[in-house]
Structures are given as C-alpha cells and as structure tokens.
Amino acid sequence: GMAVEHLPGRIIAPGFVDMHVHFPQTNVIGSPASGLLPWLENYTFPEEKRFAAPEDSAQAATFFVAELLRNGVTTALTFATSHPQSVNALFTEAQAQRLRLITGLCLMDRHAPGDLLNQGQGKRSGTEQSLLETEALIQRWHGVDRLGYAITPRFAPTSTEAQLRGAGDLAAKYPDVWIQSHVAENKDEIAWAEELFPFSRSYLATYDHFGLMRDRAIYAHCIHFDDNDRALMRSTGAAAAVSPTSNLFLGSGFFDYAGADRVGFQYGLASDVGGGTSFSPFHTMLAAYYVGREGQTKQGLSLSPQH
C-alpha cells in the first residue's frame, strides 16, 4: 500500500515567492529611524560594509537562506551588496540548498559612503568596473540550476547617469535576466530623485529613460504613483514588489491597490527585510490586509485572497 505521512499542526502549501528582500540587512531588522534615508545612513550602510569580507558574506548567506526556507519561501528576489563576494556567497549557498534565488551586484557609484560604492580597479572607474563585474556575474550564474541574475541599481539617486545607461545596455543585451530596484517609496527620496534627474517626467520615468523597464523588471514599493506612472508600469510589463511591513515600519505610505487594479499593472508581495520586520509570508499577508484597509484612496478596501 501507499505510505501515509501525518503532519499535524503543519500547513502543506506550494512554496512562497518573496519578491524583494535584502540579504545583508538581516541584522538591522527593527532598527528605528525617522524615515528611509536616515535609516539607510545610520543602520543599513554601516552593516553592508561588513560584506566586503568573504567569510562574513558566507556566514550571513547560510543564515539568510535557512530563514527563507524555514518560513516556506522557495523563490526570492534578493538584494546583495556592492561587493561581488556577497553575490558569489549568496548564489553558492542558494545553489547548495536548491533555493530558487535571483540576485545581483548592487550598482551604486555615488551618494553613499566611499567604501560602499562600487570600487574601481587599475585605470577603470568604479562605474566601469561595476558594469564589467555585472556582466561576468551574469555569465557565471544566470540560469545555473535554479538561479537567476538581476541587474540591480540600488535606486536611481545612488547611480550616475553613466551607470544607469550601462545597466540599461546590459538589460538589452541579456533580455532574460531580471532587473530590480526601488522607486517612489518615500516623499524625501522622490524629491531627491527628481532633483537629480530633472529631465524625467517622474522618478519612475527615469528608469524607463535608461532602458530599465521591461518584462522581468521588478520595482520595490511603487507607493507614490500617479496614473502616468501606473500606465508606464502596465505598458512596459514591469511589476511592483509591495512591501507592507516595511512601509508600516518606516512610515513610508501605503501601496494603492485600487489604483493599481484600475490601471492594471502587475504586483506581488515582498518582505523587504530589513526595512520589513519579518521573513514570514504570513506576516506580510496580514500587513498587506491592514494596508489595503487603510489605503490612500479607498477606506475599508478588504484584500481578498483572490488578490
């Protein structure tokens, strides 16, 4: 006969997908700040510097992958740091544990601490070197076992135009790799982005200008959008990674589900650890439910599981 296994007290479900999570931020979960930009400066950037050391990256990768699996997450789109060793450590561990994982070198060549920016080599600038390293990492890891590569500008304000242009060129050259970044999370961040890229109609449009919006492009947050932004998401096939625990924790605002549905662009849920406060998809879903009820445009919108 057939062997029957009883699992009382367990839920048997397909693996969850976490659309946006930061591997180097596990240790800064729950660090309080007045908003996104001070939080980056005071907690996140200092923590990410540790990942220059391969042994720190490897140790963090072991814990991070185990936490995802412990919470039932079997696919994750993940930010690493600006150090290639952090990317290699995370891919190596994900491959060993058979996790479906997409990550990439964090592209960041300005407006962050000097030792966290992409570093130059010989006569090559940090910008050039970061693009060469990105291509080498695509060739080494993309499509190996269950792994995929994502071209990963941290967010537009920490990349020069040259770096964003180079990232867009790589996105065109490798159409089956992913793209991931952040957009329209926080009012101060938006004002900063608009000041740095005055030629763009909006913060989101900056990414489109540099060829970074297409199918397989995932943008975290997408909170403060108008209908032109929503239409741009729809027409390019890009998707939003909605991060409700992070948005509540950092006081960033609420994703407008009704607006997204009205215009019709794709979105999914993300933990956004460490701005987000839990690896658990159940915590994320509960927070999404609360956010849906508190949302900007429609009081009392209840998110049904069909969402």
Over which residues does each language-model region extend?
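Divalent metal-coordination and catalytic microenvironments
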Residues: 9, 20, 28, 72, ...
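Metal-coordinating catalytic core of metallo-dependent amide/deamination hydrolases
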Residues: 85, 90-222
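Alpha-helical scaffold segments that flank or form the walls of functional sites
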Residues: 10, 30-100, 130-144
